[in-house]
């Protein structure tokens, strides 16, 4: 299991939350999302758990930490797969923007990749047109990623098309909403469990009435 993340420093993360949030509030929300994500991955049965970080962040006990490499997001994604696991090891990568993800989501993705006759890849579509999870039976398949435009409303479709052009059988996972805007933050917080750090952070830093529509 890989988690691709960015150090939650004010001004570097979740800038689309500002306004209505301040940079400090956005960083606290990002830190909570990352903490929830790492907690969930820690609860998911996996041969290894690796935090691939831009910046610095303390990984949970038993995790490995690797730096991100590459310029574009596509390059960093491909390098994360290449750096983290040996060839022919089923690997699932997620980011830090879906703190509502469950261990069940992740375990199901890994199981699909390890059963005989299962798919070559699993892709979790995001509601905004991107994707929240990518799992590969062989991490070498990630070589298709640098050529895909990221952070657009067509990234998910382009990724699916690229995997299929590679000749891969792809299983689609449950769509999830990721956190880009203040409205996303409120919606995702409502989908998180009561003990969620993310939900608590959103509740603690609620903007004024009507601001979530921005």
Task: Cite the ranges covered by each PLM segment.
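Conserved alpha/beta core of the MobA/IspD/sugar-nucleotide pyrophosphorylase nucleotidyltransferase superfamily
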Residues: 158-214
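N-terminal nucleotide-binding beta1-loop-alpha1 segment
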Residues: 1-16
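Short phosphate-binding loop-to-helix
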Residues: 61-92, 152-155
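Conserved donor-nucleotide/metal-binding helix-loop-beta segment in metal-dependent transferases, i.e.
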Residues: 101-129
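Active-site acidic Asp-centered loop
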Residues: 94-96
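Short, polar loop motifs at secondary-structure junctions
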Residues: 52-58
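Short, glycine-/small-residue-rich phosphate/pyrophosphate-handling segment
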Residues: 139-162
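A short, N-terminal amphipathic alpha-helix
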Residues: 28-46
């Amino acid at each position: 299991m890989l988690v691709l993340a960015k150090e939650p420093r004010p001004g570097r993360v979740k800038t689309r939350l500002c306004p209505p949030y301040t940079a400090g509030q956005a960083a606290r929300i990002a830190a909570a999302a990352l903490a929830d994500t790492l907690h969930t991955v820690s609860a998911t049965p996996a041969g290894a758990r690796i935090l691939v970080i831009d910046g610095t962040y303390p990984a949970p006990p038993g995790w490995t930490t690797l730096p991100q490499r590459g310029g574009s997001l596509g390059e960093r994604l491909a390098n994360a797969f290449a750096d983290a696991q040996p060839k022919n090891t089923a690997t699932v990568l997620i980011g830090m923007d879906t703190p509502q993800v469950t261990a069940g989501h992740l375990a199901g993705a890994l199981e699909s990749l390890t059963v005989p006759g299962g798919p070559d890849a699993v892709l979790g579509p995001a509601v905004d047109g991107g994707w929240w999870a990518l799992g590969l039976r062989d991490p070498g398949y990630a070589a298709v990623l640098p050529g895909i435009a990221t952070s657009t409303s067509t990234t998910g479709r382009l990724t699916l098309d690229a995997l299929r052009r590679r000749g891969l059988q792809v299983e689609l996972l449950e769509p999830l909403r990721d956190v880009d805007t203040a409205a996303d933050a409120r919606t995702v917080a409502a989908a998180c469990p009561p003990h969620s750090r993310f939900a608590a952070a959103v509740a603690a830093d609620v903007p004024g009435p009507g601001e979530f529509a921005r």
